[in-house]
């Protein structure tokens, strides 16, 4: 019986050593990675409110509004990052990704009414501006990504961080005035303005090794941004003197959107170095 004790003890230690080795096996995702993905992107642009104010006042101030817009398409997202092994089951990482394709809404219109105390839109008539749109481009995300290793070759992860997108507002290209059922369309100023909208990113994903280094993944991301706002100043035209003002003035036109957010559902492949 005494001779069996050392053998039993060695066997037990061997089993514990094997178990400890497996428990602390390094994840295949530890280190640098690069990846590419595509899928579907949905953008929600909040309702638009506008105002036109002229100084000195020539009784031509108006305000306008448009409904919220939804638009989407197929993105192309390029990503890089690095994972560190925190313990046997958890990794912590940092990453960055960039959306290489722009997304543009369908054109939309805005209906205008007189600002308080102004009468440039006469009773019985309407004024509608047509052909506006929004284009989103150059989206990039910077994030931290804690991950849980299901096993050496499988990973679930979260993403949280900062997102920025360039929002280009394309102003209306025409204006339609309807008086007593008769419509007349003329060219509008048009043009565009861009702003960089910052916000937050949250995401969830799953990665699985296909072969040594090569992996596939699925991912969902939500980005919420500050509301886009634009302002332009122009000099009142000589024809404005018909409203009783002989000197030139300044017209300020503002466009304020209520919100901007984006959802992405992605499928892709990557390589862990």
Task: Outline where the language-model segments fall.
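Cleavable N-terminal export/targeting peptides
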Residues: 1-29
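Short N-terminal segments immediately surrounding and downstream of signal-peptide cleavage
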Residues: 27-40
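Outer-membrane beta-barrel channels and translocator barrels
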Residues: 29, 85-87, 151-153, 209-211
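Transmembrane beta-barrel architecture of outer-membrane proteins
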Residues: 31-33, 73-77, 91, 137-141, ...
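Residues on the lipid-exposed face of transmembrane beta-strands in outer-membrane beta-barrel proteins
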Residues: 36-38, 78-82, 96-98, 138, ...
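Extracellular/periplasm-exposed beta-strand and loop segments of Gram-negative cell-envelope proteins
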Residues: 43-73, 100-138, 164-197, 226-264
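Mid-chain, structured segments of secreted extracytoplasmic proteins
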Residues: 76-109
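Alpha-helical membrane segments in multi-pass integral membrane proteins
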Residues: 184, 197-223
